[in-house]
Amino acid sequence: MHPIALAGIITVANAAGIAHAVEYPIGKPQQRYGMEITAVYLQPLPMEPDGMMKKPQDADVHMEADIKALASNANGFPEDAWIPYLTVKYEITKQGSSEKISGVFMPMVANDGHHYGDNIKLMGPGKYKFKYSVLPPNANPGSHHFGRHTDRLTGVRPWFKPFDVEYEFTYAGIGKKGGY
């Protein structure tokens, strides 16, 4: 067989073998301060380093905040670029309950790109309200610093003020864990 043809067959075979977990959207993407914030969930996932979040067997979902720059971003990020060094807090309430689930998403990367996320244990199937609180890089004094040019020639606009986005979604389960 011709080497180029063989390479093409191997490439197609490898691409077909790539598994992608099914992401379920939560509401519609929202736009704030030159950013698009998209909420999704999927099956809970094993993560590295070990201990950074709940193990898949102890969680119901892996929730994500996909935050990328819009063309109007005034902080120097090109369109569709991931925005790093944010603090993204979440709060989840199930309809009919006053109990809240809350935490802070961690920055991470997967085969579909950078995002903030966490493995979360919900309160069973039902309707949920979900709130993200998005804080700029300078709002977390305990984190690493992320510099911002402020001079007239190379500077960018000041960081945005913290804001919330809210979503509602119905959780019916995700099927067999690990059954992508």
Please tell me what each predicted stretch does:
Residues 21-57:
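Short, compositionally biased P/S/T/A/G/V-rich stretches that sit at domain boundaries
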Residues 114, 122-128:
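Short tyrosine-centred short linear motifs in exposed loops/low-complexity segments
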